[in-house]
Amino acid sequence: MSVQLDPQGQLRHLVTTEGLPRELLTRILDTAESFSGVLGKSVKKVPLLRGRTIINLFFEPSTRTRTTFELAAQRLSADVLNIDVATSSTSKGESLLDMLRNLEAMQCDAFVVRHADSGAAEFIARHVAPGVAVINAGDGRHAHPTQALLDAFTIRREKGPLEPLTIAIVGDILHSRVARSQIHALLGLGAGEVRVIGPRTLLPRDIQRLGVRVYEDMDAGLDGADVLIMLRLQRERMRGALLPSESEYFSRYGLTEQRLERTHPEAIVMHPGPVNRGVELDPQVADGPRSVILRQVTNGIAVRMAVMSIVLGGHGEAPAEPIEEASS
């Protein structure tokens, strides 16, 4: 039984995009669209989660993800606590479950979890008290669902419906939790074609079973693509010499203006960050007119607001009327 859905099929935890119904994926994006309107106002708060407490529990360092989750919770008027795991009681020998029990005793409503171990978020979701939600902010090589959802949201805003689009994911697919989540989300939302491009040493052996087309040749994989999602090399997760050098990687798989010409004339360039300029992206492409990288960051706030409002607020339907501003 899925830990993510309650018996009525409503989202109670977000651990992965794998297996989520298309209707639910669409509802998240639609709800995010409604929150985007709020973020454009002078007062960027709504009172949906006033009185709720959300704890950011990050066992791995993060800047963009933790900050956007914190902003998203604050925009919903929730109270936010950031736990410094390096100085927490877990560093003094307390078990993870004991720490969770103590935090639950403080009447928290949700944990946003980032962890180096694959499966950590699901483990926590299966052991939290009833009524406490868990949102996966990235676990090992397993999943990063909110990144995938904000990428899908960005694509829909920039390019319209996903059905006719060819989307290419380029780089270190093997070690990327983002790539797996993107594939499940994009195909779940009906994307026309999803391609993965990378050297053989950075492609999972069974990746084709997910329904993607696989390319080792960068130029062939880029041909006619509408969306390019560039991924960084996950050096911290690599074991052994999987690549000769970063300069050779760039010569074969780096996105340059010349390579960009092989794509659709109106193709967009995306990256989940952090960007390694001169490794996966030429600086001129990263800063060029087709790059929507900074818009991804902005969209991440609205998407994470949507996820929080759904797991903590029930049905998560997009408001029929514009959301009213809170007084403060």
Curated annotation (Swiss-Prot):
L-aspartate binds at residues 92, 177, 232. Belongs to the aspartate/ornithine carbamoyltransferase superfamily. ATCase family. One of its GO terms (cellular component) is cytosol. Pathway: Pyrimidine metabolism; UMP biosynthesis via de novo pathway; (S)-dihydroorotate from bicarbonate: step 2/3. It catalyses: carbamoyl phosphate + L-aspartate = N-carbamoyl-L-aspartate + phosphate + H(+). This is Aspartate carbamoyltransferase catalytic subunit. Its EC number is 2.1.3.2. One of its GO terms (molecular function) is aspartate carbamoyltransferase activity. It is an enzyme of class 2 (transferase). The keyword Transferase applies. It comes from the Bacteria. GO terms for biological process: 'de novo' pyrimidine nucleobase biosynthetic process; 'de novo' UMP biosynthetic process; amino acid metabolic process.
